[in-house]
Design a protein with these regions (language model features):
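Short, well-structured N-terminal submotif of metal-dependent ribonuclease cores
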Residues: 1-38, 53-63, 129-130
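Short, conserved alpha-helical segments within structured domains
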Residues: 38-43, 95
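Active-site regions of enzymes building and remodeling cell-envelope glycoconjugates
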Residues: 120-130
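Alpha-helix capping/helix-boundary segments
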Residues: 9, 42, 98, 116-117
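Structured helix-beta-strand junction loops
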Residues: 31-34, 71-72, 105-106, 120
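Active-site neighborhoods of divalent-metal-dependent phosphate/nucleic-acid chemistry enzymes
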Residues: 70-115
């Protein structure tokens, strides 16, 4: 199985102070980093939040993203024009809905810590299964 990481998954990967940091790393070991993908939308979100919330400079955020990308399996280079489902009727849900569309269009699962995204393409990142 191959996964598109959402913004919070990328943040959990990089930032040790994320409440999901340990869970993400355990999950990533289980599924294999070669199966983890990014896209322009999630990478831009990672840069924005790393700078705005974490306090990284642009150079620090860019370097952190470049380091993460060395350990991923791929990058979704083409993204469809948004065709959002009805459940994305609130502005706060548009990015999540778009990422489900990108994942589906590229035959990926959307990996997230957000249990509120109710879509069949979503894979909730949880504790590693033994």
């Amino acid at each position: 199985m191959t996964y598109l990481l959402d913004v919070n998954a990328l943040l959990a990967w990089e930032h040790g102070n994320s409440p999901h940091h340990a869970v993400f790393h355990a999950w990533a070991r289980q599924v294999g980093r070669a199966n983890l993908w990014t896209c322009a939308h999630t990478e831009l979100g990672f840069l924005r939040v790393s700078m705005q919330v974490v306090g990284y400079s642009l150079a620090q955020a860019t370097a952190a993203l470049a380091e993460l990308k060395q350990h991923t399996g791929g990058f979704v280079a083409t993204a469809p024009s948004p065709r959002l489902p009805a459940w994305a009727s609130a502005a706060a849900k548009t990015s999540d809905a778009y990422l489900t569309q990108v994942a589906r269009a590229n035959k990926l699962r959307l990996a997230t810590h957000d249990a509120g995204i109710k879509d069949g393409v979503v894979e909730l990142i949880g504790p590693a299964k033994s």
